[in-house]
Curated annotation (Swiss-Prot):
Organism lineage string: Bacteria, Pseudomonadati, Campylobacterota, Epsilonproteobacteria, Campylobacterales
A single Gene Ontology CC term: cytoplasm
Name this polypeptide is given: Dual-specificity RNA methyltransferase RlmN
Species in which this protein is naturally found: Campylobacter jejuni subsp. jejuni serotype O:6 (strain 81116 / NCTC 11828)
Entry GO MF terms: 4 iron, 4 sulfur cluster binding; metal ion binding; rRNA (adenine(2503)-C2-)-methyltransferase activity; rRNA binding; tRNA (adenine(37)-C2)-methyltransferase activity; tRNA binding
Record's keyword annotation contains Cytoplasm: yes
Any GO BP: tRNA methylation
Positions that bind S-adenosyl-L-methionine: G172, E173, S204, S227, L228, H229, N303
Miscellaneous section: Reaction proceeds by a ping-pong mechanism involving intermediate methylation of a conserved cysteine residue.
PROSITE patterns recorded: RADICAL_SAM (PS51918)
Active-site residues (renumbered): E89, C346
Record-linked HAMAP family: RNA_methyltr_RlmN
Length: 356
């Protein structure tokens, strides 16, 4: 039996090399990403011969949801099975956004963030992260990354034009799979597709300085998030072995070269671990480290998981840490850990074996 190719892996110009004329590619994109077609036979504006040809050569179901769990805060974690049987997790984070209309009335509507995985497992080996425990199995293709987002939007009846933010903060190190992640960014941004602007896509990294520079040179327009978590190389290497290859100085040099929209900032994620990196002297060092960088610090309270030796700090300590940063002019927020009760929060995702 002929192996079908994942059509979600293709940019329009690539698909145009296989399908003529080009306006048919536009129609196919719209059927898949905007009309949420279930199969090629649904694509009624295409001639019958083309629908048959597509069905004989392509599929657009690279991920299959085998389980989902909803948190009391509304977050939903999805366990996806890939074609080869490996599994990844993704999270939908619904949030309420309020605006004032022309009449001065307060209007509330849903805003969505989708946290996607870029690899099955991860080789970075961060000591606080559950994903790293199983090592790296393989990279996801661009279509497997896009497939997570498409499935979640479709399943939750989120219209294609509804604004969503994408964060590459699920399983894996996105910049260790830069080729496919950057292609996913481009596919998601297509006007005939989901039309998710690169400015709404944030790529997080544990600090691969070389790849940060490569990403910057691509000029995709994406936002950058650095998983920092420590203010000196000794502690950071203990928490994140990747620091042996790319130390803090190398990361900061790469960040300074990274092109960022004047209205945006580079996000620095700082995981607060009780008694390890949450002291006020750490906050003071962080202020010095970020001097001259347009930065926003996202403080995250450590999320416990099976086998972890670390503890979650008190909210009181986190607020003191935040207050010191803010008093020195550093934009800083404490991230609300959504999905904590279903192990969907930062550092809790993993490749789960076939349990069902």
């Amino acid at each position: 039996m002929k192996e079908l190719v994942n059509i979600l892996d293709f940019l329009p110009e690539e698909l145009g090399e296989k399908i003529k004329p080009m306006f048919r590619v536009k129609q196919i994109y719209q059927w898949i990403y905007q009309k949420y077609a279930n199969n090629f036979s649904d694509m009624s504006s295409l001639p019958k011969y083309l629908r048959l040809e597509l069905a004989q050569n392509f599929h657009f179901s690279p991920v299959k949801c085998v389980k989902n769990e909803q948190s009391k805060d509304g977050s939903i974690k999805y366990l996806f099975e890939l074609v080869d049987g490996l599994r990844v997790e993704s999270v939908l984070l619904p949030m309420k956004e309020e605006k004032i209309d022309a009449e001065g009335k307060r209007i509330s509507h849903a805003r969505y963030t989708i946290c996607v995985s870029s690899q099955v497992g991860c080789k970075s080996g961060c000591s606080f992260c559950l994903t790293a425990k199983g090592g790296l199995k393989r990279n996801l293709s661009a279509g497997e990354i896009v497939g997570q987002i498409l499935w979640i939007k479709k399943q939750n009846n989120i219209p294609y034009e509804r604004r969503v933010n994408i964060v590459y903060m699920g399983m894996g190190e996105p910049l260790d799979n830069l080729k496919n992640v950057s292609k996913a960014v481009k596919i998601l941004a297509q006007n005939d597709g989901l039309a998710i602007s690169p400015r709404r896509q944030t790529i997080s990294t544990s600090g691969l300085a070389k790849q940060i520079k490569e990403l910057g040179q691509m000029n995709l327009g994406v936002l950058l998030a650095i998983s920092l978590h420590a203010v000196n190389d000794g502690l950071r290497t203990e928490l994140m072995p990747i620091n042996k290859a790319y130390n803090i100085a190398a990361i900061m040099d790469a960040v300074r070269e990274f092109p960022i929209d004047q209205r945006k900032r580079v996000m620095f994620e700082y995981l607060l671990i009780d008694g390890i990196n949450d002291k006020l002297e750490h906050a003071k060092e962080l202020v010095k480290l970020l001097n001259g960088i347009k930065a926003k610090v996202n403080l995250i309270l450590f999320n416990p998981h099976e086998g972890s030796l670390y503890k979650r700090p008190s909210l009181e300590n986190a607020i003191k840490f935040q207050d010191l940063l803010s008093s020195k002019g550093v934009t800083c927020t404490i991230r609300e850990s959504k999905g904590l009760d279903i192990s969907a929060a930062c550092g809790q995702l993993k490749e789960r074996a076939k349990e069902q």
